[in-house]
Amino acid sequence: MSRVAKNPVAIPQGVEITIGADEVSVKGPLGAVKQYIGNAVTLERDGDALVCKAREGVANSRAMSGTVRALVNNMVTGVTKGFERKLTLVGVGYRAQAQGDKLNLTLGFSHPVVHQMPAGVKVETPTQTEIVIKGIDKQQVGQVAAEVRAYREPEPYKGKGVRYSDEVVVLKETKKK
């Protein structure tokens, strides 16, 4: 059995969880999130905790119980603390500027790159070379960060490009004559 699913999800004060037939919704101080969980797993409330149990006779139910538990835990964390991903621009003339729900990037192309943020995701630029993406949905925050990074991934010789702030880019050695 999945060891992840054995641990219950703690429900902090101010968080409201609604369990439907095949979906769960979590509402907290930062907002609300919904997630489809299917019929392989049952969620039961046990005081101030939520327990994930695999359904008997359903294929992959034991495997999905750990996944659903992790998703619900991320939802609870998202509506209480939120998630953020930091990106850094490395390169001469590479700049970022947040304008409302848009992110303007100057990445050495002949044109500026404008990335539209989806609903529920906010972007900040503390400096011209730092980008902070925040939101309550962990998957969505990570997806937006990956899309922004994909505009100019770090190249292997000088390391120029958009990288995660905690990313280590291994540089290659140049060709010797």
Curated annotation (Swiss-Prot):
InterPro entries: Ribosomal_uL6-like, Ribosomal_uL6-like_a/b-dom_sf, Ribosomal_uL6_a/b-dom, Ribosomal_uL6_bac-type, Ribosomal_uL6_CS
Source species, domain of life: Bacteria
One of the GO BP terms on file: cytoplasmic translation
UniProt-recorded Gene Ontology molecular function terms: rRNA binding; structural constituent of ribosome
UniProt keywords, alphabetically: Ribonucleoprotein, Ribosomal protein, RNA-binding, rRNA-binding
Any one cellular-component term (Gene Ontology): cytosolic large ribosomal subunit
Any Pfam family hit: Ribosomal_L6
NCBIfam families linked: L6_bact (TIGR03654)
Function: This protein binds to the 23S rRNA, and is important in its secondary structure. It is located near the subunit interface in the base of the L7/L12 stalk, and near the tRNA binding site of the peptidyltransferase center.
Subunit annotation: Part of the 50S ribosomal subunit.
Protein family (similarity comment): Belongs to the universal ribosomal protein uL6 family.
HAMAP family according to UniProt: Ribosomal_uL6_B
Name listed for the protein in its UniProt record: Large ribosomal subunit protein uL6
Organism expressing this protein natively: Aromatoleum aromaticum (strain DSM 19018 / LMG 30748 / EbN1)
